[in-house]
């Protein structure tokens, strides 16, 4: 994924790419447009392209973009979640995809409401140094979450071959079923088709839509 901001976004190109992906996902998954690398002044191009659901990775960028386009999109938070940012993020989003630490649970207990809904990030591959709850501890973590948990999210180890993600996505689907959870946020531009095969209900796309 590019690490520089997208400029001069072509709404027609985004619309065409989005329509193709939405057609593939129809009846199975929502298409979330990851806007981490979209500057606030380019968000209007996403409006013009017909984007409805966006995900942001940083609290500060979420606040700035939401202020400019609050009513234009449904907003999710998909980035690394710092406990000290929970209070600022909650009022702006439909879902937080990345709950995975006890300190975040504490802040959700303080600032969550009856409407708060989250996904638990699961470190399915149990990679060292990577965020998320280990599969063995998932049921206990869900039980301790003070707000509604509606699903799970994962980021599998990066691999050139999208098929390498399949066992990790399949495992997340098994964990969701075992815990009676409906939402599965998995799959990015690189492996979204595999994620759809394995039951994703939200796929998170960025560079694939802007190219």
Language model features by range: what are they?
Residues 1-190, 196-198:
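Conserved alpha/beta-domain cores
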Residues 193-197, 204-211:
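Expand to "…catalyze enediolate/carbanion chemistry for C-C bond making/breaking, isomerization
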Residues 55, 203-204:
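Paired acidic/hydrophobic, glycine-rich loop segments that form the ligand-binding mouth/hinge
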């Amino acid at each position: 994924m590019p690490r520089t901001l997208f400029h001069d976004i072509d709404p027609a190109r985004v619309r065409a790419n989005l329509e193709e992906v939405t057609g593939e996902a129809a009846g199975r998954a929502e298409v979330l447009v990851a806007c981490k690398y979209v500057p606030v002044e380019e968000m209007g191009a996403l409006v013009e392209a017909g984007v409805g659901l966006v995900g942001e990775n940083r609290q500060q960028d979420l606040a700035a973009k939401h202020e400019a386009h609050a009513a234009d999109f449904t907003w999710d938070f998909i980035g690394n979640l710092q406990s000290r940012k929970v209070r600022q993020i909650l009022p702006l989003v439909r879902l937080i995809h990345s709950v995975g630490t006890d300190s975040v649970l504490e802040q959700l207990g303080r600032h969550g409401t009856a409407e708060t809904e989250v996904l638990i990030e699961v470190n399915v591959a149990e990679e060292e140094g990577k965020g998320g709850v280990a599969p063995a501890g998932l049921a206990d973590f869900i039980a301790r979450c003070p707000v509604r948990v509606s699903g799970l999210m994962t980021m599998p180890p990066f691999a050139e071959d999208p098929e390498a993600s399949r066992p990790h996505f399949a495992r997340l689907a098994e964990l969701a079923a075992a815990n009676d959870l409906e939402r599965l946020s998995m799959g990015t531009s690189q492996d979204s088709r595999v994620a759809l095969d394995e039951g994703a209900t939200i796929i998170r796309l960025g560079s694939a839509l802007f190219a």
